């Protein structure tokens, strides 16, 4: 049975392991821990297996921002990112939810579009040659 819940510190090691598997290093471990401590991290699990997580902030020009959605490579293309985003959007009190992805990440662009997010802008120069596309979902 799959479920989404707020992550606790007991999940930190598993979430960091998934993140490291995806990006190849542990550079975001402190960010993940802080998000867990501040209750800004949702996780998706299937039985006892954590398959993905989402980190959010509430300080994007006064609106909520989904800053990170990570799915374990072996669990991709199964709707986990969509489930995490939908769960977050359903619980937020914000009138607008923003997120972003690189122009090269067409899979995530399709996820946002399928969930009713629309393009809101572009930020150049974060990653050389790969602009960041900002998306918004208006409640």
Give short role names for the model-derived ranges.
Residues 57, 100, 120-123:
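Solvent-exposed beta-strand sheet faces enriched in polar/charged residues
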Residues 71, 77-90, 110, 114:
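Conserved acetyl-CoA-binding loop-helix of GNAT-fold acetyltransferases
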Residues 125-139:
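C-terminal "cap" of GNAT-fold acetyltransferases
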Residues 68-76, 101-102:
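A short, internal acetyl-CoA/4′-phosphopantetheine-binding micro-motif in the GNAT/acyltransferase core
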Residues 103-121, 130:
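Conserved active-site alpha-helix within GNAT-family acetyltransferase domains
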């Amino acid at each position: 049975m799959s479920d989404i819940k707020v992550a606790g510190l007991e999940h930190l090691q598993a979430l960091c392991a998934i993140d490291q598997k995806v990006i190849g290093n542990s550079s975001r471990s402190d960010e993940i821990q802080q998000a867990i401590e501040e209750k800004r991290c949702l996780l998706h699990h299937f039985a006892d297996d954590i398959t993905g997580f989402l980190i959010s902030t509430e300080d994007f020009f006064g609106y909520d921002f989904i800053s990170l959605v990570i799915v374990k490579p072996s669990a991709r293309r199964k709707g986990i990112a969509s489930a995490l985003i939908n769960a977050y959007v359903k619980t937020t009190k914000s009138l607008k939810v923003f997120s972003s992805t690189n122009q090269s990440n067409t899979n995530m662009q399709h996820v946002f579009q399928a969930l009713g997010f629309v393009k809101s802008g572009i930020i150049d120069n974060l990653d050389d040659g790969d602009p960041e596309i900002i998306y918004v979902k208006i409640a």
